[in-house]
Amino acid sequence: MLLIKNGRVMDPKSGLDQVCDVLVQDGKIIKIAPEITEEGAETIDATGHVVAPGLVDIHVHFREPGQTHKEDIHTGALAAAAGGFTTVVMMANTSPTISDVETLQAVLQSAAKEKINVKTVATITKNFNGKNLTDFKALLEAGAVGFSDDGIPLESSKIVKEAMEEAKKLNTFISLHEEDPGLNGVLGFNENIAREHFHICGATGVAEYAMMARDVMIAYATKAHVHIQHLSKEESVKVVEFAQGLGAEVTAEVAPQHFSKTEALLLTQGSNAKMNPPLRLESDRRAVIEGLKSGVITVIATDHAPHHVDEKNVEDITKAPSGMTGLETSLSLGLTYLVEAGELSLMELLEKMTYNPAKLYNFEAGYLAENGPADITIFDAKADRLVDSHFASKAANSPFIGETLKGQVKYTICKGQIVYQA
C-alpha cells in the first residue's frame, strides 16, 4: 500500500482541487479523502505539492528499432517518468517503420518491459511510401492505438481521403504532420530568420496551413476524425477553428516549444533549436496560446525527438537533424510560459496534459478517482529549476539547457509503483 498525504489533489476530469490524501493498492486508487490513516503503508508527504494524474504524451519518438544510438524504448520510458509522464504514444518513423504486424509486435514486446505505459501508432502508408495504405484492421488488432506518418507529410490527397475513410470504418483516426514539401525550403528554419540571417529559403507558414486546410476539409467531407500534430502558425489555429465551426471532427496539439519560444532561439541555441515545424514568430506563439485558451487546441504533446550529440553538432546547421528532446522539460515549460505567465490556470494546463490526450485515444488514464488507475505525478509547481544537460534520455538536444524554469517533478507513480523519485 502507498499513502500520499497532504497534497493538493487536482483532477481535471471531476474538477477536484483540494488538499487531501490518496491511498493506493494493487495498481488502483482505493481511496481519496481529507484524512486517511493506514497502518504499515508506505507514505509520501506531499505537503505543498500538487498531486495530479500521471501526464500523458501522445507524440514521442523512441527510435526503436533502428536508431537506438539516439534513444531506445527503455531510455525513452525513463525520460518520460522523469518528466512526470506515465503514458506515452510512440511515433512509427523507426527503421524499419512500424508498418506491419511483425514489426509492431516486436516493438510492443519491448514496450511491455517498461514500468510506464508505452503505446505506439503504426504508419498510415507502407514504409512511409505515401502511396499504399497499411492494413489498418490487422495493425489495430495487433495493438496499434492509431495511425501516423509523422515526420513525412502525406502529399496525395487521394491517400489522405482513403486513410480517413478506412480509419472511420474502424472507429479510429489518423494524425497528420502538415508541411507541404512543394511549398517549403530548408526545414527547421522559419522563413523569416532563414531569409534574414541564414540567407536560405526556409520552412514557410503556407506549407503548414495550406496542407492543413486541405486535410481538415477532407475530414469534413468524409466525416472522419483527423488529429493535427504540432501546429505552429497563427493561420493554422484559424484553419482548425474554421473546420471545427463547420462541424468537422478535427483535434489539434501544440508542442511546448511552440508556445514558449520563437525563431530567435536559433541564434543562441543553434541546431538544438532546429525542429519541424520550426519555431515561428511571436505572433504565432501568441496565437497557439490563444488556441489553447479557447479550446481550439486541446492537447499539449512534446514531439520528443532525441538525436545524438554528434549529429546535432555539425558545422553546417542546415545538415543537422531537426528535433529536440522534450519529455523532461514539458511540464516546466507549461508551468512557466502558461501558468506563471497568467495564460492558463494550473487545472487547464493539467487537462491538456492528462485528461484530454487520454480521452483522444480512450485510454484508461489522465484522471484521479477511486477505483481508477494509480498513475500519479507529484510535483512542486513553484520550485525554480535550472535545466542542465543531465537527462534520463540518451539525448541532451534541448534548447532549454541553462534556462531556469518553474516546476520540479518529485515522484512519478505508475500502476501503483514509484517509477521516478527526484
Swiss-Prot record:
CC per GO annotation: cytoplasm
Entry EC number(s): 3.5.2.3
Amino acids binding Zn(2+) 1: 59, 61, 150, 303
Keywords noted in UniProt: Hydrolase, Metal-binding, Pyrimidine biosynthesis, Zinc
GO BP field: 'de novo' UMP biosynthetic process; purine nucleobase catabolic process
Cofactor binding comment, as recorded: Binds 2 Zn(2+) ions per subunit.
Active site residues per record: 303
Keyword Zinc found: yes
Required cofactor(s): Zn(2+)
GO molecular function: allantoinase activity; dihydroorotase activity; zinc ion binding
PROSITE patterns named among the record's database cross-references: DIHYDROOROTASE_1, DIHYDROOROTASE_2
Similarity field: Belongs to the metallo-dependent hydrolases superfamily. DHOase family. Class I DHOase subfamily.
PANTHER family for this protein: ALLANTOINASE
Protein name (record): Dihydroorotase
Name of encoding gene: pyrC
